[in-house]
């Protein structure tokens, strides 16, 4: 059975304090011990229910408390979701994440959510959902449907958390992660850089994640996307090197986890993204939109992959699907790039 290092905030801060090139070298060494450094997991994120969220997360345009111009939408039909998943798979994604702007899912929606999971799984894709807090029963129902991952971010350190969110406690988030893990679903949990937090808060977030009973299999690191109408719309820009440091420290502290470049990539140039991959990032969201905020379009991602010699990671599927994935990989990396589908529209 794998053993995990118990981290302290002081140890995490010591990593943040390292000279950048030394930190990158250490992170790359750790990355190569656990992953193929040329493989990048490609995921698609679809908003299956948008806006009108009762929570007060200060960074989020989906909160009903802020005037951001976002139009709310009801839960998508199962058939619509599966059609989006099919198109995402055809465009090269191997993992399909479905997000709903809820504090927690209603019982009346659970049968539809289960059908979405079952349908996407039938396509040979990994499944992920982010729906807010889950009860024990809800976690087990999603597990029975075949859900692979559940995303529930901690966002920041326990100390800074109350400055950003008051409608859900930090402990509630930890409780949901425990319910997900106990149900046999893999955990996806990370945070946001640029909320106004200190380096110590970033260290505290990573310590919380790394010291879970088992570290998350997937750790999304977001750069704040400032949205007009939210309380954080005038926050200072995130320094690219500080973001890269956070990726590198996450890689060192959670060596077996996928570290995902999530929201904020639209604000990063190619050089910053390349350094993030060098620092140990090995997963991206692929498509023009992450729920309600911009993301680089697919063509740009594939061009960057070609420049860096990176390959989209393939999932374990049937023989026929493996051949299809290989053909897609060749097409994406070496052929003319077609216009790909934006599943999040």
From Swiss-Prot:
Quaternary data: Homodimer.
Leader sequence residues: none
Functional note: Catalyzes the conversion of dethiobiotin (DTB) to biotin by the insertion of a sulfur atom into dethiobiotin via a radical-based mechanism.
PANTHER family hit by this protein: BIOTIN SYNTHASE (PTHR22976), BIOTIN SYNTHASE, MITOCHONDRIAL (PTHR22976:SF2)
GO molecular function: 2 iron, 2 sulfur cluster binding; 4 iron, 4 sulfur cluster binding; biotin synthase activity; iron ion binding
Radical SAM core domain ranges (all copies): 38-256
Protein's UniProt name: Biotin synthase
Protein family: Belongs to the radical SAM superfamily. Biotin synthase family.
Coiled coil start-end: none
Species whose genome carries this gene: Yersinia pestis
Cofactor(s) this protein requires: [4Fe-4S] cluster; [2Fe-2S] cluster
